[in-house]
């Protein structure tokens, strides 16, 4: 038997990769973790000459061991194709002494495309492999980015439905339009009267609702998740960190075995966890800088060892990071306990029941590769403007948080290790905030969202992405809204089982 998966809370063991992807969340509410982190078995200098698709196979085959070579290569080929506007898929851009890993060249101009382009193919392949004949209902909470990418990935995929919940006042105008204009007879999106944590908690409750599960199965449905709690989201994200290192090696920017640092703007902790998995696989990564916005629960955690979600929720200009419950941190907690499911489960119950937990000194020592930092909205805007004024390179507000935190980290630590910054969205996904950062409030006056887009393009010389042009005149197809307590009824209504 190849690599298997178990729950971080101990309720499920020896689950195959395909079943873990199909389930999304373990039955006990935990997240699936591989029984071990496999080591890269291709030399880095050989990876340096590989395409993104070839690199993806070499990384993913180590985690998805019950997929055949043909199955996995077929999923990869269907995912990383002309949907991306560059053959490199994830190019690197050097600016102001750092390497920006541009993860926004997919169909929805955000990093979630990197995993959500392949997840539908991994999932439908898994259903065939496991003889599942029920319709798979993808249930997803989004802070703005995952929703559109998931809907685009699953649109009209046979045997699937997708239902996305997002906070009504917690996403950008472009993000909302991208979701509400999404085509596909199997797609639904619902605005909730609450924040992202409310949406995520509501989705998790539905996953754990045994009565709802039985009712769905009786009607021929089965839940799964497209959120980064699904291991099928996490594994594809490891690929681009390996690819980035290999391309730096190929370009002569680093030497074989030379350490790099990685800076990631962080909300739900999935993207930076993928970088950590790459490090555990043998990629020469020294420090992982976890960049937070004003919702700095992760900064406080890495600084004090205490995770406390009982605090004010702040709406910022980097809305996809406006999160107080970072779900994927549970996987790192599990690893830091020595994979003790009882210990990690106890801490997660503390978070659920009391809103906080504290890790031991030994667990903190295990996490010493991580450094936390945060940037205020003002620091974020100033960083975007300075980088643009100095170099002409334009970044979005989430990448701005990362760049700001990196600047402070480098100043305070004196660490001049070559650094990759995860650039997680096109500046046009957050054109209002980016324009305000580089041109001030007067740059926005009298302009609607698309006039701001055009002004930003004229000012920066950066072309407007096709994904934004497509929604300029697209018809709104989705108008559902509900309260936080009505999410289950909304799902049942959409599926016709109410």
Regions found by a protein language model. Give the residues of each.
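PLP-dependent amino-acid enzyme catalytic core
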Residues: 1-498
């Amino acid at each position: 038997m190849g690599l298997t998966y178990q729950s971080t809370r101990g309720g499920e063991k020896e689950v195959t990769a395909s079943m873990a992807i199909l389930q999304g969340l373990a039955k006990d509410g935990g997240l699936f973790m591989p029984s071990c982190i496999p080591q890269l078995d291709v030399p880095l200098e050989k990876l340096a000459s590989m395409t993104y698709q070839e690199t993806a196979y070499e990384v993913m085959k180590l985690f998805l061991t019950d997929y055949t070579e043909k199955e996995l290569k077929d999923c990869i080929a269907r995912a990383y194709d002309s949907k991306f506007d560059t053959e490199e898929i994830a190019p690197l851009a050097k600016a102001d002494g750092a390497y920006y890993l541009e993860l926004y060249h997919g169909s929805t101009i955000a990093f979630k495309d990197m995993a959500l382009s392949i997840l539908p193919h991994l999932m439908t392949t898994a259903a065939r492999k496991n003889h599942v004949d029920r319709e798979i209902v993808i249930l997803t909470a989004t802070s703005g980015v995952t929703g559109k990418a998931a809907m685009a990935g699953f649109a009209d995929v046979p045997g699937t439905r997708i239902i996305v919940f997002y906070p009504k006042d917690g996403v950008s105008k472009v993000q909302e339009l991208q979701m509400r204009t999404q085509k596909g007879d199997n797609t639904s999106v619902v605005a909730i009267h609450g924040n992202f944590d409310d949406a995520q908690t509501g989705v998790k409750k539905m996953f754990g609702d045994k009565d709802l599960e039985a009712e769905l199965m009786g009607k021929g449905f089965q839940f799964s998740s497209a959120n980064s709690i699904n291991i099928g989201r996490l594994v594809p994200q490891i690929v681009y960190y390996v690819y980035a290192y290999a391309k730096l090696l190929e370009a002569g920017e680093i030497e074989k075995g030379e350490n790099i640092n990685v800076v990631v703007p962080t909300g739900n902790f999935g993207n930076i966890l993928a970088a950590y998995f790459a490090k555990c696989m043998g990629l020469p990564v020294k420090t992982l800088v976890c960049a937070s916005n004003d919702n700095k629960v992760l900064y406080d955690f890495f600084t004090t060892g205490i995770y406390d979600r009982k605090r004010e929720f702040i709406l910022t200009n980097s809305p996809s990071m406006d999160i107080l419950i970072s779900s994927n941190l549970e996987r790192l907690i599990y690893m830091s306990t020595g994979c003790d499911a009882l210990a990690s489960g106890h801490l997660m119950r503390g978070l659920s029941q009391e809103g906080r937990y504290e890790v031991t000194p030994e667990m903190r020592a295990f996490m010493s590769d991580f450094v936390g930092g945060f940037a205020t909205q003002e620091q974020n805007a100033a960083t975007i403007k300075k980088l643009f004024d100095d170099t002409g390179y334009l970044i979005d507000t989430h990448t701005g948080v990362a760049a700001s935190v990196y600047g402070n980290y480098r100043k305070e630590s004196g660490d001049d290790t070559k650094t990759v910054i995860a650039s997680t969205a096109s500046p046009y996904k957050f054109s209002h905030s980016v324009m305000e950062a580089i041109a001030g409030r007067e740059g926005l006056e009298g302009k609607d969202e698309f006039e701001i887009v055009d002004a930003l393009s004229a000012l920066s010389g950066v072309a407007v992405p096709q994904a934004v042009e497509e929604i300029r005149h697209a018809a709104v197809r989705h108008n559902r809204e509900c309260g936080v307590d009505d999410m289950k009824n909304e799902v049942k209504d959409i599926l016709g089982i109410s």
